[in-house]
């Protein structure tokens, strides 16, 4: 462990008693935001084409990588305006009264979009509606131009009757539009609703009318894509993400390595091997997988000894990913929490104050880890059945993506040793099963502290990382108050909680 040099201490007279662990850090080149102006993502497509599925999944991904994003589903606004849905007649293009109501709902939703992007620190809004007419899309473009929003269209095109029928039965039967209705009646009414939309549907025209717009067409659930005039970095990320996801049934298994020697000693980080109980877990994991009879299962590990030893016992091929390595604790590697608190009391307190943003001196933060793990998420979205054997912090980040957890919850998600999380993607989320393999292990979980700072203790300076925090419904924007080589500003007060949907329109 090395502290700051004497010259560094002399240059920082306000901190002469404690080594400055952070002066050697380089500034990160990432900007504070990933967008240079607010973006409105506009869904397009007939009902039962997966628009809400894409909207929710894309929003979950963007929030996870740190771009505050929110879905505005027009069906929710319509159901607020019209409390009882009677039949497909409401969606006929010659139903003038209904057309007025639907247009008014769209205008109200767009006003909420404006408030979110201009007043609530939002960066991306997803307008989840059919938007099948050129008139509607032109109205949205005019709205965006007036408010200086970028627009990116996502059109979902599907002509496979089996996919459409499956979507109706899986999602629409449970829609608020159809309380207490049987499947046959729902299918009949919804197919007639689709026919109503087909009368006025004008797909995006990349060769003429819409050639200057930015958009992606997703054809038959990802069989083909058409991309047109991508404007910026965030739009390219959206395109890349949409080209990697699929809807085929699969299961993702997440677990930590077996208990390690350092786990027994209470030490963090390092590269120790498995304990006796850790090896027992590896054998129990092998038996579990054999009983499951999982087809074409891929196994991924980190490059650390404890995950590799766990995978070796399975008797199957596995792939090692360096980016699955545990969070880098920097100068605190191979120390216990008690040792960290004694040797670096301010660092210990700072991490308790804001665990997601806190970066170990010479190491990583959870925020850094999310960025590092993005390729893993992309690859998981492309794959079928996968078992990921990783580490506590890594598993928390992966779980936060699949379970749509925010920055406040992520660092405190419970990921006990010798426990498997079975994740099964469903229509608008992810089903989770927790399976304990009945092999004892130490508890490595630390609960969130209730009081970060005693009243008689000087609050520790908050240190913001260089790019946007993982977004959540309680998005908090705090100014940077410490840069390398400059005197910190006055300490921040403890963070307080901020007060901060689906279907066809």
Curated annotation (Swiss-Prot):
Residues that bind beta-D-fructose 2,6-bisphosphate: 256, 263, 269, 337, 351, 355, 366, 392, 396
Site feature: Transition state stabilizer: 256, 263, 391
Keywords from the named record: Acetylation, ATP-binding, Hydrolase, Kinase, Multifunctional enzyme, Nucleotide-binding, Phosphoprotein, Transferase
According to UniProt, the tissues expressing it are described as: Heart.
What modulates its activity? Phosphorylation results in the activation of the kinase activity.
Molecular function as annotated in GO: 6-phosphofructo-2-kinase activity; ATP binding; fructose-2,6-bisphosphate 2-phosphatase activity; protein kinase binding
Modification N-acetylserine, positions = 2
Q: What is its EC number?
A: 2.7.1.105, 3.1.3.46
Q: List every stretch annotated Disordered.
A: 1-20, 445-505
Q: Where is the composition biased (Polar residues)?
A: 450-476
Q: How is it modified after translation?
A: Phosphorylation by AMPK stimulates activity.
Protein known as: 6-phosphofructo-2-kinase/fructose-2,6-bisphosphatase 2
What is its quaternary makeup?
Answer: Homodimer. Forms a heterodimer with PFKFB3.
BP term (GO), one: fructose metabolic process
Q: Which organism is it from?
A: Homo sapiens (Human)
In this UniProt entry, the residues modified to Phosphothreonine are 468, 475
Question: What is the gene called?
Answer: PFKFB2
Q: Which residues carry the post-translational modification Phosphoserine, per the record?
A: 29, 466, 483, 486, 493
Q: Where is the active site?
A: 128, 158, 257, 326
Q: Which SUPFAM superfamilies match?
A: P-loop containing nucleoside triphosphate hydrolases, Phosphoglycerate mutase-like
InterPro entries per the UniProt record, alphabetical = 6Pfruct_kin (IPR003094), 6Phosfructo_kin (IPR013079), His_Pase_superF_clade-1 (IPR013078), His_PPase_superfam (IPR029033), P-loop_NTPase (IPR027417), PG/BPGM_mutase_AS (IPR001345)
Family the UniProt entry places it in: In the C-terminal section; belongs to the phosphoglycerate mutase family.
Q: What does this protein do?
A: Synthesis and degradation of fructose 2,6-bisphosphate.
- Residues reported in the UniProt entry to bind beta-D-fructose 6-phosphate: 78, 102, 130, 136, 172, 193, 197
Cite the residue spans of the region called 6-phosphofructo-2-kinase. Answer: 2-248
């Amino acid at each position: 462990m090395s502290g700051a040099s004497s010259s560094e201490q002399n240059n920082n007279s306000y901190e002469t008693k404690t080594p400055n662990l952070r002066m050697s850090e380089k500034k990160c080149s990432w900007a504070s935001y990933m967008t240079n102006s607010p973006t409105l993502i506009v869904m397009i497509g007939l009902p039962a084409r997966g628009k809400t599925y894409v909207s929710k999944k894309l929003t979950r991904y963007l929030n996870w990588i740190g771009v505050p994003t929110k879905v505005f589903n027009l069906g929710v606004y319509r159901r607020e305006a019209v409390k009882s849905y009677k039949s497909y007649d409401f969606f006929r293009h010659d139903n003038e009264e209904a057309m007025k109501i639907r247009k008014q709902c769209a205008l109200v939703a767009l006003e909420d979009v404006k408030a979110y992007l201009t007043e609530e620190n939002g960066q991306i809004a997803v307008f989840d509606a059919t938007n099948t007419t050129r008139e509607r899309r032109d109205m949205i473009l005019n709205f965006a131009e007036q408010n200086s929003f970028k627009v990116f269209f996502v059109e979902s095109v599907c002509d496979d009757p089996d996919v459409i029928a499956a979507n109706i039965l899986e999602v629409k039967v449970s829609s608020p539009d159809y309380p207490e209705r049987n499947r046959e009646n729902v299918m009949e009414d919804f197919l007639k609703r689709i026919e109503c939309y087909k009368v006025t549907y004008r797909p995006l025209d990349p060769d003429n009318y819409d050639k200057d717009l930015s958009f992606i067409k997703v054809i038959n659930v990802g069989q083909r894509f058409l991309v047109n005039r991508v404007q910026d970095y965030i739009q390219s990320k959206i395109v890349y993400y949409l080209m990697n996801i699929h809807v085929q049934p699969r299961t993702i298994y997440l677990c930590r390595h077996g208990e390690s020697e350092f786990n027994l000693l209470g030490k963090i980080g390092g590269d120790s091997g498995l304990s006796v109980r850790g090896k027992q877990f590896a054998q129990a994991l092998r038996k579990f997988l054999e009983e499951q009879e999982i087809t074409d299962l891929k196994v991924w590990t980190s490059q650390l000894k404890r995950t590799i030893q766990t995978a070796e016992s399975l008797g199957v091929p596995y792939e090692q990913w360096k980016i699955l390595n545990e969070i880098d604790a920097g100068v605190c590697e191979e120390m216990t929490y008690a040792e960290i608190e004694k040797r670096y009391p301010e660092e210990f307190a700072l991490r308790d104050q804001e665990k997601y943003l806190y970066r170990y001196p010479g190491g990583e933060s959870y925020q850094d880890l999310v960025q590092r793990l993005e390729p893993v998420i992309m690859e998981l979205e492309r794959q079928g059945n996968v078992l990921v054997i990783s580490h506590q912090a890594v598993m928390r980040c992966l779980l936060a993506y699949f379970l749509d957890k925010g920055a406040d919850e992520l660092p405190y998600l419970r990921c006990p040793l010798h426990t498997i999380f079975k994740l099964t993607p469903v229509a608008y989320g992810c089903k989770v099963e927790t399976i304990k393999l009945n092999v004892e292990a130490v508890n490595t979980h630390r609960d969130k502290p209730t009081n970060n700072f005693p009243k008689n203790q000087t609050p520790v300076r908050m240190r913001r990382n260089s790019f946007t925090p993982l977004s959540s419904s309680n998005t908090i924007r705090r100014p940077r108050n410490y840069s390398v080589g400059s005197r910190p500003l006055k300490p921040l007060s403890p963070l307080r909680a901020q007060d901060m949907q689906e279907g066809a329109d």
